[in-house]
Amino acid sequence: MKCFFINLDRVPERRTHMEREFRKVGLEAERFAAVDALRIEDYENVRYVPHAGARWEIVKSQIGVFESHRRIWQAMLAQDLDMAAIFEDDMFFLPEIVDLLSRLETAAPQFDVVKLDSAFYPVPLSAPELTIGRWPLRRILSDSTSCGAYVITRQAAEQLLAWSDPYCDHIDDFTFSPRPGWRAYQAEPVVASQLTLLPRDFADRYVNARQTVVQSERNIDPRLRQKVAKAPFPRRVRKEVNRTMRKILWRVHGRRRLLSSGGILSASRMAPESLYGEDERDLSPDGLGELVDPAERS
């Protein structure tokens, strides 16, 4: 399966890190130059339009990330690929990723996208709908943070390109949010993670790479963290009413219906034996905080 990783030209440290990760597990990958959020105006065919989606506005860094993923989807079509694995440049891989990618390559067209990583907070997932080797695939039933590692089919890339013309949303919410007929799955246990989400005692082995991630310009450059305009008051009221109703429905019916159908509320962790051998310690990343129902998230 063709693998891409997204990397800004001016952050070679992350490129070095990702090349090391791919070598570690024996995979080859093509570097894809990320869209530079500081030069968005220099790019042609940027499809971001304020208010044209789930959000009212998004910041430049989010536009750059979204455009980078869109352009990889376009590259898939240009290269006539039936499927591809797409990664951001702050990832850690388990060796099992090789087996999972190989098995997924033979499983199409049973899915549109398969999420390989996790942000390690609870997300409602369906009962297993497919089993790929040791990995049950559960349909993602809510927003799911992180677009750091996923497999996508050609047909799904075409569909996402159409849906995102125009767009105003975060790339992870846009890619994995439930839609009628959209087959977005979570593979469990996960085989990849952003470095900042790894268990502290394990991630300390990657201290230099972690520092590179922590120093991401998205977090520290004020030019990329400009304030966005608030939606008009009536829209904000409607959004809050809808959010409150979803909370009520989740508490009254949602959780029970999910569990009775074989679904789970899962944080999609890495298998302890994959990280630590037989030493099964708590893999909750530092600072995760109290686990909350998905309806509690704004």
Residue ranges and their predicted role:
Residues 1-87, 91-298:
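An acidic/histidine-cluster motif and surrounding catalytic segment
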